[in-house]
């Protein structure tokens, strides 16, 4: 005779919670925050017309279903083949098992080499194709590209073009300059606003000039 378990005896699968926050701040200071937002928002502009490129900043990435301890929150990550839109976290098994292909980390004075080495191992293990790490205080950029099962160091990043992003890195004595595919450089939020204001002012002047010539700008 088959003995059935009572309701109280049946094993109920535990529902695992995947927190949206690890309790850590997005950045430790204004310089680090500036670089995180500049890279993230400029990449959003580069891929604005591609609905299947998801870009996020400081979003928890869970690569393994069933284990909420295996996680990382890259300063910026890019996932090709995934739609744009809201996420509380990036649970890879809900994303066609696509790992972010490109990751950026911006160093702060508080970062330790051991901490960054652990991040590199994590990204190598869980499928990142390109990993870039920038230290804005010492103007140092290092990068790694996937070779088989590992992330191998890129010998020189001055002039390097990201295979995935098609952006170019340039190191000057004062800073890192990142160029979009069209050659224009990444701008801060303030610089983007100034550029927009300048363009609007030039449009106003042009419209006034056309009216002086008897041309209605709205008909053009």
Which residues are covered by each model-predicted region?
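C-terminal interaction segment
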Residues: 2-10, 15-24, 45, 61-74, ...
């Amino acid at each position: 005779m088959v003995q059935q378990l009572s309701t109280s005896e049946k094993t109920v699968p535990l529902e695992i919670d995947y927190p949206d926050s690890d309790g850590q701040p997005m950045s430790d200071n204004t310089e680090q925050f500036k670089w995180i937002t500049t890279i993230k928002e400029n990449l959003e502009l580069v891929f604005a017309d591609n609905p299947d490129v998801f870009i996020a900043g400081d979003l928890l990435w869970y690569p393994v279903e069933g284990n909420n301890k295996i996680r990382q929150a890259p300063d910026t990550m890019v996932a090709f083949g995934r739609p744009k839109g809201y996420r509380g976290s990036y649970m890879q098994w809900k994303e066609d098992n696509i790992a972010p292909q490109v990751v950026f980390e911006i160093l702060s004075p508080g970062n330790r080499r051991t901490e960054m080495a652990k991040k590199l191992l994590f990204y190598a293990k869980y499928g990142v194709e390109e990993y870039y790490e920038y230290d804005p205080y010492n103007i140092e950029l290092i990068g790694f590209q996937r070779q088989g099962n590992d992330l191998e160091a890129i010998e020189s990043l001055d002039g390097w073009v990201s295979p995935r992003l098609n952006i170019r890195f340039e190191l000057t004595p004062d800073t890192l300059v990142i160029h979009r595919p069209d050659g224009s450089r990444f701008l801060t939020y303030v610089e983007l606003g100034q550029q927009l204001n300048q363009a609007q002012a030039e449009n106003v002047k042009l419209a006034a000039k056309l009216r002086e010539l008897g041309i209605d700008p709205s008909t053009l």
